[in-house]
Amino acid sequence: MNELVGAINGVIWSPALIFLCLGVGLYFSLRSRFLQLRHIKHMITLMFQGRPTDAGVSSFQALTMTLAGRVGTGNIAGVATAITFGGPGALFWMWMVAFLGASLAFVESTLGQVYKEKINGEYRGGPAFYIEKGLGVKWYAWLFAVVTIFSCGLLMPGVQANSIGASLEIAFGLDPNVTAALLAVLLSFIIFGGVKRIASFSSMVVPFMALGYIIVACVIIAINITELPGVILLIWKSAFGFEAGFGAILGQAIMWGVKRGVYSNEAAQGTGPHASSAAAVSHPVKQGLVQAFSVYIDTLFVCSATGFMLLITGLYNVQGVDGAALYTGIAGVAAGPGYVQTAMESMMPGFGNYFVAIALFFFAFTTIIAYYYIAETNIAYINRKIHRPWLTFLLKLCLMASTVYGTVRTADLAWGLGDIGVGMMAWLNIIAIVLLHKKAFVSLKDYETQNAQGLDPQFDPVRLGIKNADYWLGERKDEPAANPGQTTSVVREQSAGKLNN
């Protein structure tokens, strides 16, 4: 089984996908004049604007729902495996994926908002919606929907569950079978409650767990601050093959950095737009910018915290393509959460081991919940045409079964299946956003023009020449106005003009 999964991964995660992720991210960055740098301050402001409505959630709730998917086991176990198979330089390439991927996240999340719909009283959107409405290729949209349901419902939850089981067993000696049963019960309570319960749970848990983890990591880094310059130099030299010990795995550093970067921050994967489309906003670009910043939170903050902890303490291993040990800093511990637990425990005895296990539990559990929401959204897309309500119930059963199975299986198999799911979605989504990116950048220019005039930007797809954005033409009735009394028609009249930014 492991050999088959590995062979499939070798095809999906070929160099073509690696360079496509980096190349398209670079092109979008240049095309937008590096919006991920120009609008950082504005991104932070937008995170706290807006409020939930009967059909949608606030910008902050949408952000936390997206972070629930982005911030998961990839931020802990994923970083450990990236360093193991790609060396310290893999962390640099994770940073590159985050920086360039922010532009990808902007494009896909903006498109998700442009083409979203209201289904059964809730906002739904994502690649399947913008592929059908923007490209007019229904079979491609259905293909993405089916692949996403399969990936998020069956292939990817096992990675998160496996890391939860491994970390709890290391810290508390809890049998993985008990953990599997516990996860199934907790999941059933959340996923049978609908999108509002998912948003409420995520907005309460995600900010605190991420902030707490970063603070503890920063304390460890501060204690070892004299080691930081050397670690940064090691990362830099390893990233480009200048470090003698890791020069032979330069290609592995790039591959594992990109693979784990995409797995962690989800940029270009097509999962982020599902949650961002649920936000009630006056202009799609607002969520596009918020989601671009969420990539930074995931990788530049949380993943970096993990990477620095491992490299500063020296408690990690690196192996070559042939499996030969290139560096051994920790013996008898499999690549994954055990590295991070050992590193933190070495600096904070009696605390670190348990803290990582608890943090990872919340990271991974909220990610599984996010996977459910993503898969459910694609079922909602399919049900617009065939109307099979039982598909949602079947998804819930499959998700819980996948979680239980992943908890008790080997880590290699769990990660392999997860990588297949991520890779399939990335291929399909990147092709779509390359073909549709002009609509996102037309929307960006419109937003920047209105914002420069001191207006609260309002979206008018007709004026911008964007077709099939049906929600914005007549269904947008319960959105909260940021500036009461400022009508859409006035904004439309005033928003024509040159981009002034």
Locate the predicted segments by residue.
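Alpha-helical membrane segments and immediately flanking helix-loop junctions
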Residues: 53-85, 111-114, 119-128, 132, ...
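Helix-loop-helix module between adjacent transmembrane segments
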Residues: 24-29, 97-121, 127-191, 359-369, ...
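Extracellular/periplasmic helix-exit of transmembrane alpha-helices
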Residues: 29, 106-115, 120, 218-234, ...
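Extracellular loop-to-transmembrane helix junctions
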Residues: 6-42, 46, 82-122, 298-305, ...
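Transmembrane helix-loop junctions in multi-pass membrane proteins
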Residues: 31-36, 74-79, 88, 154-165, ...
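Flexible loop linkers connecting adjacent transmembrane helices
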Residues: 34-59, 81-83, 87-91, 95, ...
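Membrane-interface loop-to-helix entry segments
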Residues: 20-44, 162-168, 174-236, 376, ...
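N-terminal alpha-helical transmembrane segments of multi-pass membrane transport
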Residues: 1-73, 83-89, 434-501
